[in-house]
């Protein structure tokens, strides 16, 4: 019986299938199912260092889901946890890095773009990659017809199965985004 790769345990990608997937493969292969996500969440008040330890000890090298037992609040990647984004947020909040929690640096679910489950069913992985790159978002939620979260797609999982990077460039989508970076000449996060 095939097993699921532990680093993308929630995705529908079997180890044998990973070598066969390409940009024309069904996007359903990279959707992380909400039922699996809910069983692997960490609390929003978890420190950044604790989250890194959880990733290391659980062989979960790419993405952690943040929330309560029944509600997904956000997503955080290992890349974010070790990037300068953490220091920028600490500086912006005027706190020490050690005082930040995953809630401070996660990508909140309410800011994630959403795709309908039936659209993802018709899409290929290449479509998802282009969507992420054009939106400048590393995570996309998948919702059903009632807007209930069905799953999440992570650029790290897309990159892993395609064996090529997904280029995510932060993009200002509102005047508030522009205004927030102007006083300190910071980057978008």
Predicted regions and their residues:
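Tandem CBS (Cystathionine beta-synthase) repeat/Bateman regulatory domains
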Residues: 1-189
């Amino acid at each position: 019986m095939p097993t699921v790769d532990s680093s993308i345990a929630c995705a529908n990608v079997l180890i044998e299938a990973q070598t066969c997937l390409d940009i024309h493969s069904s996007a359903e292969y990279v959707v992380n199912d909400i039922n699996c996500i809910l069983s692997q969440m960490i609390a929003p008040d978890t420190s950044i260092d604790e989250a890194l330890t959880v990733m290391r000890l659980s062989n979960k090298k790419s993405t952690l889901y943040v929330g309560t037992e029944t509600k997904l609040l956000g997503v955080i990647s290992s890349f974010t946890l070790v990037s300068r984004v953490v220091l920028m947020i600490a500086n912006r909040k005027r706190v020490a890095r050690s005082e930040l929690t995953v809630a401070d640096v996660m990508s909140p679910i309410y800011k994630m773009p959403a795709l309908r489950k039936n659209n993802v069913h018709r899409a290929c992985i290449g479509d998802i990659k282009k969507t992420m790159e054009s939106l400048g978002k590393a995570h996309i939620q998948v919702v059903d017809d009632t807007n209930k979260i069905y799953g999440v797609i992570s650029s790290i999982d897309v990159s892993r199965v395609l064996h090529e990077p997904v280029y995510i460039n932060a993009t200002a989508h509102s005047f508030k985004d522009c205004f927030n970076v102007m006083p300190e000449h910071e980057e978008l996060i």
